[in-house]
Amino acid sequence: SDGEEIEQPEKIYYDQAQRRMNSNNFNGAIESLEAIENMYPFGKYAEQAQVELIYAHFMNSETEAAHSSAEKFIRLHPRHPNIDYAYFMKGLSSYTRDRDLFIRFSDTDISNRDISGEKQSFAELTEFLTRFPDSQYVQYAKQRNVYLRNMIAKNELAAADYYYSINAYVGAIRRANYVIENIPNSSENYRALKILENCYEALGYSELLEDVRVIILSLIHISEPTRPLHI
């Protein structure tokens, strides 16, 4: 009828993508969203398709594609209302979820474990939190960063323990110092200090040993429970 809006092919692709995502058919959704991006790059749904591609790739366990899509969106649309989402997903997709960092090795040098993805994710989520302190995704990003921070620290100290076990004290000191200097709020700080204490004692570094013991004692005192208030 006159005045009735005719549905355009672009919208057909977009609606198809929504149906496919709603049914967890992310392969199909990616196909539909990429069709919009390729066939209608300046159309009504082009920008929305690009941002939803980030999500679809991520949910399809294609973390590299999700990261690339996020970077592309940031580059093309730096002032888009959903730009915070792109930064958030960029950081989230850097971390490969199926990686097991804590497998016990018997004869393997565990200092060779690759945690570059985790470090990149931590850095990118930190950038997101700095840029968008009021974003709706802030709370999740903070929780993820706490998890990543502790994971990175645990991995560094697993390597430090390995170095200590083979009397490679300088390597152990380097790893423990990395945790103290770069991940100061992790749950592993006390353990890092104890590794330094053991290494300094083994090397006969009396002044450094005294310094680190002072810090350890101060942490112990901080963690002591306080007496109850008088009523």
Residue ranges and their predicted role:
Residues M39-A46, R75-Y85, R99-D100, I115-S116, ...:
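Short solvent-exposed coil/turn linkers within tandem alpha-helical repeat scaffolds
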Residues H221-I231:
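Single conserved hydrophobic/aromatic residue that forms the stacking wall/gate
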Residues E62-S68, S94-E124, Y163, N167:
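Short coil/linker segments at helix-helix boundaries
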Residues E5-N60:
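Post-signal-peptide N-terminal segment of Sec-exported extracytoplasmic proteins
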